[in-house]
Amino acid sequence: MPEEVHHGEEEVETFAFQAEIAQLMSLIINTFYSNKEIFLRELISNASDALDKIRYESLTDPSKLDSGKELKIDIIPNPQERTLTLVDTGIGMTKADLVNNLGTIAKSGTKAFMEALQAGADISMIGQFGVGFYSAYLVAEKVVVITKHNDDEQYAWESSAGGSFTVRADHGEPIGRGTKVILHLKEDQTEYLEERRVKEVVKKHSQFIGYPITLYLEKEREKEISDDEAEEEKGEKEEEDKDDEEKPKIEDVGSDEEDDSGKDKKKKTKKIKEKYIDQEELNKTKPIWTRNPDDITQEEYGEFYKSLTNDWEDHLAVKHFSVEGQLEFRALLFIPRRAPFDLFENKKKKNNIKLYVRRVFIMDSCDELIPEYLNFIRGVVDSEDLPLNISREMLQQSKILKVIRKNIVKKCLELFSELAEDKENYKKFYEAFSKNLKLGIHEDSTNRRRLSELLRYHTSQSGDEMTSLSEYVSRMKETQKSIYYITGESKEQVANSAFVERVRKRGFEVVYMTEPIDEYCVQQLKEFDGKSLVSVTKEGLELPEDEEEKKKMEESKAKFENLCKLMKEILDKKVEKVTISNRLVSSPCCIVTSTYGWTANMERIMKAQALRDNSTMGYMMAKKHLEINPDHPIVETLRQKAEADKNDKAVKDLVVLLFETALLSSGFSLEDPQTHSNRIYRMIKLGLGIDEDEVTAEEPSAAVPDEIPPLEGDEDASRMEEVD
């Protein structure tokens, strides 16, 4: 039975908190939590729920609003009293509601929340278990709740969390209808009385609540009055505060006089400081995602985007949609104009899509809501079906969320396709986010085809403009069965590469892929529109040939068979095989990689990885093939020399030099560049007619040994033998 205390006519009843609630409050008060600010979110969310209820009731019975038409939430900090007050004009509580809801009947979530807390859950989840009110004790030592329901008198609930609370009829200032929560803040929590802090917390957690949240602040302003009024005001103040030691001072900020001898002299004026109450609405940005897209202007979208992201520029594109049926949610998605500098920083928490459930903010870093490759998309998702008490663990298992995610990805791809029709804007988008699209091709097998339609590349025929793979296919020759591409560091480098010589000469278009991520992209993108993607830097390049060309190729293979064998013997393990090339025109030779090995570009990328796996590098790098150009005079002369004497040291020397030069021109790096340089210098001396013996006689220290170790050795295979 509650204990009754009589104070004159006022009856105060004391109740004990239900055991689980007392335990929860003890946990909240005695444990340190860093994000105490969530108490404000919870109290505002409760106020919003109460306003939702009265609004719903008023739909069937408009007279419910006779006790107050305006639906709003007010926040009133009072530094003198050290109180923070929240007032709403919601449905209010009856005495029975007060006793039951705030203390004697445990909500089903109380125990679950305590178990979650002890298991390491975050305090910010408190509202999701229906016990958000008690988060007030994170910052308050005492809480007073004054409430008025249409069906009952005005009551006051009060507790300092000592295991009990009191309820009494309240004969103070009538509040009409609704609830007033007065927090008597702890000494170390006065930051929540500061204008800046309150605004910051409301903006972070509650800026999209569907009712106006107004902050009431006592401020000072200067007022200009005449001397007579100043004297009167001063007199009044002195009378009011005559018992006070410190009397208010009227600040004289100067007087305006006219030195006119006329009778109409201007009255002397003084400036005094007066106090006034400033009212500022904190959530002017209403949840526009709940409105009809046809009624929203681009300016409104722009303002909303800026308030959501703190970006100073407008968005590039927007997609506003709702899904109805078995599942109901609304979403508003934006593409920014530029990529953030930390777009691919793994450790950084991305707060790009805010998740709301029925207009109440749940979280802003929900990985399950959008795949990583779309992490640049900003926006809001508001679900009608997710429970408010959703936790991160539950989200990971949520089937509803999986459906929402699928829809978001689909709508994002629609948005990209729409944007692609506007060449100018798509160019800006592609410059900023092409890496994301390529990452999507690598990761998202379901949407790979749609993503591949969004890719744009420079090609051997596109000039300064970029072209899509669809446009490439539309320009393909009748005999062409594949899409030819080359990967490299820059457009200039790949355009001048030996690999594209024959392909371009035959009139086939080559796609230039110059971003490191392209290497990963083409590993997954094997074909486009039924046409396979073929690298011109890998073995097995097949160009459409007529009978004459086939015959010529067979003759060349037979003619150069012995040279190929000899070159393979000289280079030994450096190459897997030496063959006749069908891709060279003006270059004597090139290095190609096996179909499944790394390209030169990929090898360069992998070597640059700080945490590379050396075991993988060993077998992926080993597959190099040397292709020689049968029509090149260097190769023809080398064949003749080899036919004459296959043990000629000069032949061996030239083969190694050709191989190393081909490595460089094909985009690979040399393991021992110094030896290669020495070999080149020696060639220069020969060309200039400088006698090697003279140099060695003058500088014995720089003498070259008579016999350089043989080329066949694993370690020293790249060293050059002395030229006779």
UniProtKB/Swiss-Prot annotation:
Residue(s) carrying N6-malonyllysine: K399
Interaction with BIRC2: region residues: 1-214
Region (Interaction with NR3C1): 9-231, 264-608
Feature type site, description Cleaved under oxidative stress: I126, G127
Molecular function terms, GO-annotated: ATP binding; ATP hydrolysis activity; ATP-dependent protein folding chaperone; protein dimerization activity; receptor ligand inhibitor activity; unfolded protein binding
Superkingdom of origin organism: Eukaryota
Positions of region (Disordered): 222-270, 694-724
Biased composition (Acidic residues): 225-244
Regulation of protein activity: In the resting state, through the dimerization of its C-terminal domain, HSP90 forms a homodimer which is defined as the open conformation. Upon ATP-binding, the N-terminal domain undergoes significant conformational changes and comes in contact to form an active closed conformation. After HSP90 finishes its chaperoning tasks of assisting the proper folding, stabilization and activation of client proteins under the active state, ATP molecule is hydrolyzed to ADP which then dissociates from HSP90 and directs the protein back to the resting state.
Binding site for ATP: N46, D88, K107, F133, R392
PTMs per UniProt: Ubiquitinated in the presence of STUB1-UBE2D1 complex (in vitro).
One GO BP: protein folding
Glycosylation sites: S434, S452
Keyword Membrane (UniProt): yes
Region entry Interaction with AHSA1, spans: 215-552
PTM annotation (N6-acetyllysine): residues: K435, K481, K624
PTM annotation (Phosphothreonine): residues: T297, T479
Residues the record lists as Phosphotyrosine modifications: Y301, Y305, Y484
One Pfam family hit: HATPase_c_3
Residue list for modification Phosphoserine: S226, S255, S261, S307, S445, S669, S718
PANTHER family documented for this protein: HEAT SHOCK PROTEIN 90 FAMILY MEMBER
Its job: Molecular chaperone that promotes the maturation, structural maintenance and proper regulation of specific target proteins involved for instance in cell cycle control and signal transduction. Undergoes a functional cycle linked to its ATPase activity. This cycle probably induces conformational changes in the client proteins, thereby causing their activation. Interacts dynamically with various co-chaperones that modulate its substrate recognition, ATPase cycle and chaperone function.
Free-text note regarding domains: The TPR repeat-binding motif mediates interaction with TPR repeat-containing proteins.
NCBIfam families: PRK05218.1
Protein name listed in UniProt: Heat shock protein HSP 90-beta
Organism the protein comes from: Bos taurus (Bovine)
